[in-house]
Design a protein with these regions (language model features):
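N-terminal beta1-alpha1-beta2 module of alpha/beta enzyme domains
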Residues: 1-77
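Flexible, glycine-rich active-site loops centered on histidine and acidic residues
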Residues: 2-23, 84-107
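Acidic, glycine-rich active-site loops and adjacent beta-strand->loop/helix elements
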Residues: 50-53, 80-89
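A short, GP-enriched loop/loop-strand-helix hinge that lies immediately N-terminal to
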Residues: 75-81, 107
Length: 107
């Protein structure tokens, strides 16, 4: 069995103020989850791709590259990749580069 963390990169509303979190703050929070998951020995961290105002993760490979720079062991994957939005060759190349950056941890 494998255990991991998945984030869709949603911009949640602050329960106290009702305002959406800023993308920069939410990114720091999600990267923190990935670091903690790595430290706790979880197997995989996944991020989703979205293109709307409620989400900030339009490029999973970029977010996962930032994750790779902060983690040592956890495997990195995209929870969703929208094939209709991106050139398939470009997606392959981005994840091949991520695999090099992460020293073989990209899936």
């Amino acid at each position: 069995m494998e255990l991991g963390v998945l984030s869709l990169g949603d911009l949640q509303r602050d329960q106290r103020t009702g305002r959406r979190h800023r993308p920069v703050d939410r990114m720091a929070e999600i990267l923190g989850y990935a670091v903690l998951a790595d430290q706790l020995g979880l197997d995989v961290f996944a991020i989703g791709e979205h293109h709307s105002a409620e989400f900030f993760t339009s490029s999973p490979a970029v977010v996962l590259a930032a994750t790779a720079a902060r983690t040592a062991r956890i495997r990195l994957t995209s929870a969703t990749t929208l094939r209709g939005v991106a050139d398939p060759v470009r997606v392959y190349e981005d994840f091949a580069s991520l695999d090099v950056i992460s020293r073989g941890r990209a899936e």
